[in-house]
């Protein structure tokens, strides 16, 4: 469990996870199938909205993103690794060309508008 600077509860969420990898073009033939396996593992363990994105300004940067419903689900998700999961992660670390380990962003989502925003739910009134 990573150290947190926000005081969140186990049921806080949803939690968005983004992991940045630096992958050279010559390694894409191995990286992309590993990420397909990663997607399968994440979904098996309860992740939602899994995505893989490539940075348009720095194409060596690939970002894996997914969501889990709560903080406790994220913690549990990290403890569900099988031997095969660990081997896939180790191989990803070998392909990663960054000076440090892949950067992990753990974020809690917050609504900026109420679920019943007046802009979208105003009744139509005739001004004539």
Spans of features found by a protein language model:
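An amphipathic, aromatic/His-enriched active-site/gating alpha helix that lines ligand/cofactor pockets
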Residues: 40-49, 67-104
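Solvent-exposed loop and beta-edge segments used for protein-protein assembly and interaction
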Residues: 11-13, 44, 58
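Short amphipathic alpha-helical segments
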Residues: 26-50
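Intrinsic disorder in cytosolic terminal tails and internal cytosolic loops
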Residues: 1-17, 29-33, 38, 81, ...
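Short, well-ordered beta-strand segments in beta-rich or mixed alpha/beta enzyme
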Residues: 15-22, 51-80
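Residue-level signature of transmembrane alpha-helix interfaces in integral membrane proteins
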Residues: 62, 83-86, 119
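Short, well-ordered helical secondary-structure segments
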Residues: 4-10, 37, 49, 53-55, ...
């Amino acid at each position: 469990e990573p150290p947190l600077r926000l005081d969140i509860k186990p049921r806080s969420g949803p939690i968005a996870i983004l992991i940045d990898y630096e992958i050279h073009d010559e390694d894409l033939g191995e990286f992309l199938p590993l990420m397909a396996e990663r997607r399968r593992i994440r979904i098996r363990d309860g992740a939602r909205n899994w995505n893989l994105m490539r940075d348009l300004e720095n194409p060596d940067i690939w970002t894996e993103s997914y969501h889990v419903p709560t903080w406790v689900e994220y913690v549990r998700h990290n403890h569900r690794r099988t031997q095969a999961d660990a081997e896939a992660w180790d191989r990803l670390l070998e392909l990663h060309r960054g000076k440090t380990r892949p950067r992990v962003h753990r974020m809690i989502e917050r609504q900026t508008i109420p679920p019943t925003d007046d802009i979208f739910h105003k009744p139509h009134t005739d001004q004539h």
